[in-house]
Amino acid sequence: MDKRFKWPPKKRANYLESPYPHIPSRGRQRNLHGHPNQTQHLHQHPGKIYERQQYGNGRGGHGGGNNNYRKLLHSLPAEHGGGAMAPPSSGGTVCAGADMVKLISENNNLRRMVMLNLNLMQEQTDSIAAKDKELDDQSAKMSVVKAQNEELKQAVAQLEAANQELCKQLRRKNQRRNDNDDDDDDPPLPPAAPQQKLIRCHAETQTVFREREQGTQTIDAQPQFANALPRGINMKESPALDHHAGAVTNQPASKRSESKGRGEFNGKKVSTFILQRMNQDFEHHIHEQTEVAEEHEMEAHKEQISQEEDQLVAEEDHLHMQEVHTEEVVGGDIFHDALESIEMEVVTEELVDMEEHGQSVDANGHIEEDDDEDDEDDENSDKDDDSEEDDYPWMHSDADVNARTEEELWQNQNYLLELDPTEEKTCAPSAHSTPNHQQKSSTQAEIRKEGNQNRITEKLLQLKPEPMVDALEAPILPKWVAFKKKDKEHESVPESPEVPKQQPHQEDAIVDHNAIKNQLEVPKPDLKPKDQPKDEQRQDGQLDVRVEPQEDVRKVQKETLKRQPEDAPKHLPKAVAPKVTKTSSRESTLPKANTADIKDAPAQKVIANHQSTKTQTDPVKTQRLQVKIRQYEMHPDMRTGSSAPSDIRKQKNVDPVSTPETKTIKSKSMLVNDKKTTSETSQSPDQEIDVETVRRKLAEHLKKELLSQSHSSQVTLKKIRERVATNLIYPPPSAPVSSTTITPAPTPSTTPTPGSTPQHAVTSSMDQEISAAKSKSKAAEQIATPLTPQSNSSVSSTTSTIRKTLNNCSPHTYSKATARSGKLQSRFRTATFPYSTRTWEDQEFHCDNEFFLEEADELLADNPSLEIPKWRDVPVPPSSDKIDTELLSDATFERRHQKYVKDEVDRKCRDARYMKEQIRLEQLRMRRNQDEVLVALDPLRASTFYPLPEDIEAIQFVNEVTVQAFGENVVNMEARDDFGVPWVDAIEAPTSIARSKALAEPVATLASKKIPTTAAEARHQENHSSYVFPKRRKRQKNR
């Protein structure tokens, strides 16, 4: 018992020496102020323990109920004055006892709760300790792994140092080897100077050289017989092309350069996978004049080096980046190491990033993303564009090259993007130019893979200027300014929509362009543009246009005019006019505009062909737009036309702001290839726009681009003329498919709407108004048909009839309608699915609760009017008596039905035992009554209806299998018109009974289900199932 309920052992005042000394010490002095007729003895029953009653009397139903034994010390001084508590009431004893019991029970409950809480806290403490132990184990493992990682890093550092030392030794040996090796054909090189010329080359020109570099890595000093090799080895020059400073991609490689490691160019670290794809298409051809003895010496040299190559393979696998010192230009040696290894200069991380995400302009002025290039581009990987560098005036200053600001870097990148799409150039090898390795900041270029990994990666290569460039430097500057001004005039003048007018302007542009090229006197070899996807070439009629005479241009125009729809004779096709004039940097780097020509009146709205390209979510693109705004501030005299030509196949996103503006266009100017072509006669001075308007429109466009990032991508429904030939919906709808018939009902601006077949057709403002009106009138009538697989399945599902299949056939096999259609006119019945005549094998698979489900189905099918118990809720007021309320608990239900269940199980056990006894008695009776002893016969041989394997004569693969019964083919009676079985097909059944029989499934019984169960399981299933034995019960005789 708790210490609180123990009596105090200390004696107090008025303590009586009695057998029960604890009674006078309670809070209530019972006999001092009791009733006059009450007995004055302390204990009416001296031998009885008053522990519980006296404890409860201290809190009796009188005024001093709060004076319990805890108040004892404070109430002692009042005892001498006759007591400080009122006498108890007559009924205080019973209530006090009840309160005492309640208090003890509550105390016990509290103790129990405390123990439960303690146990719970102990369990939680144990679980936390276990988790701490697990975390300690994990931390120990992590420390072991970190230690191993540090060891691996040290090993990698050692291997890297060893590899660098080997590379330095081999580089020094190659330098000594090439000191005496010189070609007298090449003119002497000027001293090394900072690079001032940027050319673009593919990054796929290093792989072969790197592989050959591994073959020449050696540690020991090799004989110097390799110096005798002429420079013609491994070199192939393009004979038909001139050499000039701007074309250097396939340099002659007379020796194997080991100066650069796998991931290092000019001290710059570049991602390894770029370098692995370099030099793929470089052709190595041994010169025909090489002597046979020298070739044998080279083979012997390779055999010696292959032994040490195996040692360096393991080292180079661990090295992702290497730093190699900058090569010095060897005096008198024009074939420098950097020339063979094709040193590449990564300007900054931003420039590489921009070029990776930049957009290439094809021959028809459409923008293609880098991830759309196929593997077909690999065949052009050794050719690229380097003809634009002659037009940059700032490249002739060394200080500007070394100290570029961010804006100048963006300008440089933007000028590199302005390609002449009609010129096809190839980069000829230049043997008399030595690249100077200019040291930049050691920022590692992060090349990102987008889409196809086989796309062409372009880098910036810097070359030292040559004497020819110095000679042409003075005349280039004024001509470059004049040429750019003429480009600005061309791009800002709209073109009239007539076909005959455009061709003379294009011819003038070609003549002017060719004249400027001749004046610059810098030969520009052909560059094959990046191959476009084949589907786009088929749809758009785009052609690979080369810089050819004017007759070829006219041929291209005639061919593309034939490919356009006949109902649009007054519109020019998109592939008619290849852009010949170079676009300025402002034009090539404009944001993907939704606006028409900026020089037109402000009332001119957005032209629908100028759609926004993919929503720009890259922050680098936002930075690009900001740089363009600064460029417009720096060059106020630049006048821009609408640029960023859109590829309709790619660009189906339109800004939410510019979507409603396409309906109110009043301009009559037409776009050709989404650009304004040259028309000098229609130029007027009042169309010029000031810098503020350009700045304002650029700010609006930047706001639109930022706003479009928060919205989902939208698809523009282009209003194209009806073309019944192409259809994206299968099965095709009844009406001819066009853009207007597919146009759904008006949807929110953020929901993508399905677009029709992309067709590169020029859409003017008048056509847009007409098509928009047509789409508005038909939008209410047409039902939106989304181009999704769900729509196809939903359309087809509405036409199919729902029908239950039979046991072992599909609906169309035994259907009479199929037989009438003539598809099953063979002599024997056939099936188009794997048919099995062993039907008993198909009954081995069952689902859970299959018997009960089948029983329920049979009950519902046999008697649809079967009464099912129903109930309803009857609200019972709280004051009502609960005598008549039925208990619905599971325990009550089981207790109520346990007797019946037990009786049924006992009955079935008796029945099973009785049946076994009867069988045993029948066997004994037959044994006693038999006349002769039965002789065991041999078992019958098991045979089959199927042909034996040795009787097979041929094997035939067919789509339909013959249906057999007992080894014979079943005759197809449904092929005959005079025969029909109504109960086979529910559709042909004339009566409801026949239809129900046709649709009925076989009854599942325990005997028909061959379930592999044990004897105990089978007996339990039989005893506890709802099936009854089909036996006649005998009434037990009462004895």
Swiss-Prot record:
This is Protein male-specific lethal-1. InterPro entries: Msl-1, PEHE_dom. Keywords: Chromosome, Nucleus, Phosphoprotein, Ubl conjugation. The keyword Methyltransferase does not apply. Residues 865-983 form the PEHE domain. PANTHER family: MALE-SPECIFIC LETHAL 1 HOMOLOG, MALE-SPECIFIC LETHAL-1 PROTEIN. Residues 886-904 are annotated as: Interaction with mof HAT domain. A motif (Nuclear localization signal) lies at residues 1032-1037. Its main location: nucleus.
